[in-house]
Amino acid sequence: MADIDARLREDVHLLGELLGNTIREQRGAEFLDKIERIRKGAKAGRRGSAEGAEQLSSSVDGLGDDELLPVARAFNQFLNLANIAEQYQLMHRRDDKQPLPFESRVLPELLDRLKAEGHSPDALARQLSKLEIDLVLTAHPTEVARRTLIQKYDAIAAQLAALDHRDLNSIERTQITSRLQRLIAEAWHTEEIRRIRPTPVDEAKWGFAVIEHSLWHAIPNYLRKADHALHAATGLHLPLEAAPIRFASWMGGDRDGNPNVTAAVTREVLLLARWMAADLYLRDVDNLAAELSMQQASDALRASVGDSAEPYRAELKRLRERLRATRNWANASLSETLPAPEAVLRDNRELLDPLLLCFQSLHECGMGVIADGPLLDCLRRAVTFGLFLVRLDVRQDSSRHCAAMTEITDYLGLGRYEEWDEQTRIDFLLRELNNRRPLLPSYFKPAADTAEVLATCREVAAAPAASLGSYVISMAGSASDVLAVQLLLKESGLQRPMRVVPLFETLADLDNAGPVIETLLGLPGYRSRLHGPQEVMIGYSDSAKDAGTTAAAWAQYRAQERLVEICREQQVELLLFHGRGGTVGRGGGPAHAAILSQPPGSVAGRFRTTEQGEMIRFKFGLPDIAEQNLNLYLAAVLEATLLPPPPPQPAWRTMMDQMADDGVSAYRAVVRENPEFVEYFRQATPEQELGRLPLGSRPAKRREGGVESLRAIPWIFAWTQTRLMLPAWLGWEAALSKALERGEGEVLAQMREQWPFFRTRIDMLEMVLAKADADIARLYDERLVSAELQHLGAHLRDLLSQACNVVLGLTGQTQLLAHSPETLEFISLRNTYLDPLHLLQAELLSRSRNREASLDSPLELALLVSVAGIAAGLRNTG
C-alpha cells in the first residue's frame, strides 16, 4: 500500500511539475505563484489549518475576471493528470514479488472455488462459454471530456508506463520526460470545452472511438486470459466462437426526451457502425495477409483457393475485397439510399468462415503457434463485434406511443385510444396484431410526432436483425405499452420477432412489473412474438429520484424476485436489463459487487446493463483497464449464476420493508413536501447553469416544472458539483436511525454480514458519504443562497452528518472507508485540487448570476471548466 502511495504521489508530482512548466511558459512565473499559493492553501486547509483556508479563500476572491478561466483550467488539468496517474497505478507493471491485482486473479480463483464446490470441468467450460453479458454503451451529458483530449491523456498514460521500466538510462529517461512535457503542453493549449453541443451522431462516433482505441484490443486479450484460466482449472479450452461479453449501444437510438435523435439519425448511425466495423476488420486482414505467407495448406483451404502458391493470402485477399465493398457501400449509403452490391457482407458467417478456414488449416499443418496469434485475435473480434460492431437499441417514452395510437384510432373513427381502459386497449391491440390486413391506409398523413414514431419503426423493420438490440419503452407501466409497440412495428413492415422491452422506472411501476409481465405471458400469441428470453429493464435513476435510494433499491430487488418467480412458473427464460448510472444515486457502484448482490436466480447466465457517459472512459477507455473490467463482469456473472446468494431471511425482509417506508417518507418530506426545496436547489447548485452547458445532445429537462420534470442525470450532477451528494443518501439516515431506535441494531449487523444485497448498499453508501463534504456544500450556501433559505441547507447538512454517523456505527469504524486506505488516498490526493475549483465555481456562479454574461464570455467558459474539473475529480458524476 505504502509503495502504491509513494509511486502515485511521485507520478502526480511529476505531472504537476510539467504542467507548472507549461503554465509558467505561457503566463509567467507570477501567475504560477498564484496557482501554487491557492494549491498550498487548499492543502493546509484540508489539514485543519485556519490560516491555509484563509489563504485559499482570499487568493480566489482576489482573482480578476481575466484570471478566472486560466485558474479554473489549471486545476482542471491537475485533476485530469491525477486521474491518469491513478488509472496507471491500477494497471502498472508489477514485479514477480507483488501479488496480481484482484481483477487478474478473480476468474482463476473463482474457477478453483467452483471446482471445489463440485462443478465438473465440462459444466464449468460449458457455462463459461455460453454466458451472455451485454454491455450497453450510452452517451450522457456528464461525459464532459473532449475526444481530442482523451487521446492525449491516453498518450500520457503510455509515457508513464514507459517511465516505469527500471533499466532506463538517463538519456532514455530524459527523452520520455520531454515527450510527457510536450503532451502536457499540447493538452494545456487545447480547449477542453466544446463550444457547441454534440449531435447524437457525434456521440455515436465517440462510442465507436472507444471500441476502436480500446475494446478492439481488450476483447481478444481478456478472452485469451479467460481461456488460459479455464484450461488451467479444467484442461478444457473456450470454444473459438464463444463470446461471453458483447456490446450494444444507445447512442443514436435513444430518443427518450431527445428530439435530436430522429429516424434519419438512427439510419446514419447504423451505417456508420457498419462502415467502422468493415474498416477495423480491413486493418486486421491487411496485417494477416502480410503475415500468413506460408505454402502448406489443408485440403479444405486448397479446395477454396485452388493451387495458389500462397493459399492463406489468396483466401484473405478475397475477404479483403468483400470488406472493401462493404465499407464503400456503407459510406456511399450515408448520402443516398443504395442497393447493396453482391460483394457486400450480409451475414457474420461470411466474415467468420474464411478466418476459420485459415485457422483450422494452420492447425492441421502443424502451425498452431501461428494460428493462435493475431489470426485468433481477429476471429474473436469477429465473433464478438460481428459485421455491425454494436447492436443498436431503440428507446422511446411510452407516452409517445400512446399519442401515436390515439391519433391512429381517432383517424380510423374508433375513438381515442388514450381514453380507453387497459382491457379495451389490450383487446384492440391483440385483434390488430393477429389481423393480416394493414391498420392504416398508405395515404395516412400523421402529425409530425406520430410520423417520427412510425418512421423510426420503419427503420427498425428495414435494418438487418443482427444490427439491432432491443426496443426499450421508458416509463412503461402496463401490458398495452408493450403490445402498442409490437403493433406499430408490425404496421411498419417488421416481419420477424424483436425484443420489445418495458422499462419500469417509478416506485409504483416497479411494484407493478410482475403483474404486467404475468399478463403479457398469458396473452394468446405473445410468446411467438418474443425474440429469445423475456427481457425486462429495471430503472435505477428515476426510481431513486422518485423515492430515494433506500426505497428504490428494495423495490428493484423485490421486482426482480417476482419476475424470476413468474418466468419460472411460466417456463419462460428471463433477461434482466439494469439501467444503471455512474453514481450511487442512479444505481451505480462497483459492478462486481452489484452483480453478486442481485436476487438469487436473477442472473442465470445472462446479464445486461448500461455503461454510461464518463464511466465508459474510466472503465473502458484504456485497453488494460478495459480488460480488467471485462474480467470482473465475466467472473461476477459466472459466480452469480453458479453460486447464487441464499434468499433473504423473513426478518430481513420485514426490516427492509420498514426501512423502505421510513426512507421514502424522509426523502419525500424534503424533496416533494417542503415548499422551499425547489428554490433552495436552484440557488445552492449550478442546476440552472448546467442546462445551458453544451455537455450532451439531450435536453436537461423533459418539460417545464419542478424536480419531477428534471431528468435524473442533471438532478444528480448538480448535487455532485456541490459535494452534498443528496440523492445518493437522503432517506438512509432516517431508515437506519429508526431501525437502531427500535433496538434492531443486531439484525442490521447480521444483514450486513450475511446478505450481499444489504452489504453492497451500505458499502456504496459509505463510498458516497466519503466523497460528500458538508464544508464545501456550506461554502456554496454562503455565496449563493438567500438568507431566508439558509436554514434548509443547514438542515440538510445535519442530515448528512447523521447519515455518516449511523454508517460508522454500523461498520464499527471511526472513519469512513478506513478499511480501504487506497481509496482514501485517491480521494485525499484529489481534494487538494478540488477545493479551489469548488471555491472558484461558487464565486463564478455568484458573479454570473449578478450580471448578464454571454455563453462564450470568459466567465461562462470558466464556469464550464469548473464543472468539467469537478466532474473529473469526483469521477462518477451522473
From Swiss-Prot:
Listed GO biological process terms: carbon fixation; oxaloacetate metabolic process; tricarboxylic acid cycle
UniProt feature coiled coil, ranges: none
Active site: 140, 545
Membrane-crossing residue ranges in chain numbering: none
Family affiliation: Belongs to the PEPCase type 1 family.
An example Gene Ontology molecular-function term: phosphoenolpyruvate carboxylase activity
PROSITE patterns: PEPCASE_1, PEPCASE_2
Matching Pfam families: PEPcase
Record keywords: Carbon dioxide fixation, Lyase, Magnesium
Cofactor(s) listed: Mg(2+)
UniProt function note: Forms oxaloacetate, a four-carbon dicarboxylic acid source for the tricarboxylic acid cycle.
Any one GO CC term of the record: cytosol
Name assigned to this protein: Phosphoenolpyruvate carboxylase
Matching InterPro entries: PEP_COase, PEP_COase_bac/pln-type, PEP_COase_Lys_AS, PEPCASE_His_AS, Pyrv/PenolPyrv_kinase-like_dom
Cysteine pairings via disulfide bonds: none
UniProt-listed Enzyme Commission number(s): 4.1.1.31
Gene name linked to the record: ppc
Superkingdom, taxonomy of origin: Bacteria
UniProt entry tagged with the keyword Transport: no
Catalyzed reaction equations: oxaloacetate + phosphate = phosphoenolpyruvate + hydrogencarbonate
